[in-house]
UniProtKB/Swiss-Prot annotation:
Gene Ontology terms, MF aspect: triacylglycerol lipase activity
EC numbers for this chain: 3.1.1.3
Disulfide bridge partners, by residue number: 75-112, 283-292
Reactions the enzyme catalyzes: a triacylglycerol + H2O = a diacylglycerol + a fatty acid + H(+)
Keywords: Disulfide bond, Glycoprotein, Hydrolase, Lipid degradation, Lipid metabolism, Signal
Pfam families linked: COesterase (PF00135)
Signal peptide range in chain numbering: 1-15
Protein name (database record): Lipase 4
Organism: Diutina rugosa (Yeast)
Record-annotated active site: 224 (acyl-ester intermediate), 356 (charge relay system), 464 (charge relay system)
GO BP annotations, alphabetical order: lipid catabolic process
């Protein structure tokens, strides 16, 4: 109690930090002893009414004299169970997400496009600190910037003598940010959530100097959907990462996500989901279906959106809402853009967890036979030929000793097909697109990592998103990667400047003779080769578009 009282007095006595924006407005933040935070700054007009689903419009009203001391609400979320076969859990979660309690703990709404800047205490304009811009994950269905506190990373940067400024932003998810279909393409409104991120990066370029940051030293980083979003920003406008003639960012870090294996915005599955949302919203007979969707209440749109499959429903990573090639900003199939060199030329770090697919395979426990697994893959990958499905199933057999969690032998096979499906989902969505990117990226220096830290954890192993724990909440030996090495990369473009106990090798190709991966296990860090599951790589990525969704 005494310590808490002393700390509260220090906070109250310390002068509130200020920053001056590019337009001359001065704003006030929160002094939190070890850092100073400016939270919930609007960077776009509220995307409501006629702006629903559209790319964002920059915020233009004066902020002069305003205080920004708490996070803004997250953007609207969908129920991640989506159209679960059993109505009870879906209905219960729908009710919870719309309850006053949920809104009090995790507020969300359409007026949500805000940005947060957190800096070490005492940072002044002219400090020119490197800037790390975080893009959150959540399957393009849920999430918000307030869920990822940056204090651990900022503290680590100060202790290293390599202080950074941490920026995070909200962006629209689910139908609000990634609705697809021909009507969306015709209007030019595809990938609104990516546009939100881009406008946030432009806000950083315009304003971060007033907080003590260096706009020429920006690193973008993210996990899961955030990592895929980083990739989309690398591919934006065929790799043009400039704004007002200068780069928006000089480096990128991707944690569990690379190119999105998705059809165009007017492709069959995106159109199917659009039609489903339209019908559920009661707009099926409207002459202008988009106008109808813009006119309905937010609660009604939430219900219609949550009538589509969610990440935790049976179709799993065949997500209803994804970044998709729109012919304008994501100009083509993302794998082709990387092959053709249409990717920003910046240094990158990209890595994965060893068992990325286990959590997502829990929604398909009713698949127990080879025949059912084949049907599951046929339904998931509608472009794949019978021969390609045969090759996939041969590369990922039902032999439980070969599935995920990997290297666990006969254990963790909660159904005869669970480990097989977990292996396919993890490799298709996360692990092997990383290898494809590294083999084809023609840009800057490349580093890659793979974690096996939780290999002894039953059923889910070193599962998707466990890195967030060691990055933002708890310190372990892997924090040397997720904090220290990333901070060194943002400062010096070299993760080895963090003083790791092993040298992190540069990656040239998956076939290079030396080690090319930094690996993490339960005991520490070591290096190894990116040469596992080559048959799976060939099955999935000899013709990547066969497995697009």
């Amino acid at each position: 109690m005494k310590l808490a009282l002393v700390l509260s007095l220090i906070v109250s006595v310390a002068a509130a930090p200020t920053a001056t924006l590019a337009n001359g407005d001065t704003i006030t933040g929160l002094n939190a002893i070890i850092n100073e935070a400016f939270l919930g700054i609007p960077f776009a007009q509220p995307p409501v009414g006629n702006l629903r689903f559209k790319p964002p419009v920059p915020y233009s009203a004066s902020l002069n004299g305003q205080k920004f001391t708490s996070y803004g609400p997250s953007c609207m979320q969908m129920n991640p169970l989506g159209n679960w076969d059993s109505s009870l859990p879906k209905a219960a979660i729908n009710s919870l997400m719309q309850s006053k309690l949920f809104q009090a703990v995790l507020p969300n709404g359409e007026d949500c496009l805000t940005i947060n800047v957190v800096r070490p205490s005492g940072t002044k304009p002219g400090a020119n600190l490197p800037v790390m811009v975080w893009i959150f994950g959540g399957g393009f269905e849920v999430g918000g910037s307030s869920l990822f506190p940056p204090a651990q990373m900022i503290t680590a940067s100060v202790l290293m003598g390599k202080p950074i400024i941490h920026v995070s932003m909200n962006y629209r998810v689910a139908s609000w940010g990634f609705l697809a279909g021909p009507d969306i393409k015709a209007e030019g409104s595809g990938n609104a959530g990516l546009h939100d991120q881009r406008l946030g990066l432009q806000w950083v370029a315009d304003n971060i100097a007033g907080f003590g940051g260096d706009p020429s030293k920006v690193t973008i980083f993210g996990e899961s959907a955030g990592s895929m979003s980083v990739m989309c920003q690398l591919l934006w406008n065929d790799g043009d990462n400039t704004y007002n003639g200068k780069p928006l960012f000089r480096a990128a870090i991707m944690q569990s996500g690379a190119m999105v294996p998705s059809d165009p915005v007017d492709g069959p599955y995106g159109t199917q989901i659009y039609d489903q949302v339209v019908a559920s919203a009661g707009c099926g007979s409207a002459s202008d279906k988009l106008a109808c969707l813009r006119s309905i209440s937010n609660d009604k749109l939430f219900q219609a959106t949550s009538d589509t499959p969610g990440a935790l429903a049976y179709p799993s990573l065949r997500l209803s809402f994804l970044p998709r090639p729109d012919g304008t900003f994501i100009t083509d199939d993302m794998f082709k853009l990387v092959r053709d060199g249409k990717c920003a030329n910046v240094p990158v770090i990209i890595g994965d967890q060893n068992d990325e697919g286990t959590v997502f395979a829990l929604s398909s426990l009713n698949v127990t036979t080879d025949a059912q697994a084949r049907q599951y893959f046929k339904e998931s990958f509608i472009h794949a030929s019978d021969a390609e499905i045969d090759t996939l199933m041969a590369a990922y057999p039902s032999d439980i000793t070969q599935g995920s969690p990997f290297d666990t032998g006969i254990f963790n096979a909660i159904t005869p097909q669970f480990k097989r499906i977990a292996a396919v989902l993890g490799d298709l969505a996360f692990t092997l697109p990383r290898r494809y990117f590294l083999n084809h990226f023609q840009g800057g220096t490349k580093y890659s990592f793979l974690s096996k830290q939780l290999s002894g954890l039953p059923v889910i192993g070193t599962h998707h998103a466990n890195d967030i724990v060691w990055q933002d909440f708890l310190v372990s030996h892997s924090s040397a990667v997720y904090n220290n090495a990333f901070i060194a990369f943002a400062n010096d473009l070299d993760p080895n400047k963090a003083g790791l106990l092993v040298n992190w090798p540069k990656y040239t190709s998956s076939s290079q003779s030396g080690n090319n991966l930094l690996q993490i296990n339960a005991l520490g860090l070591y290096t190894g080769k990116d040469n596992f599951r080559t048959a799976g790589y060939d099955a999935l990525f000899t013709n990547p578009s066969s497995f697009f969704v």
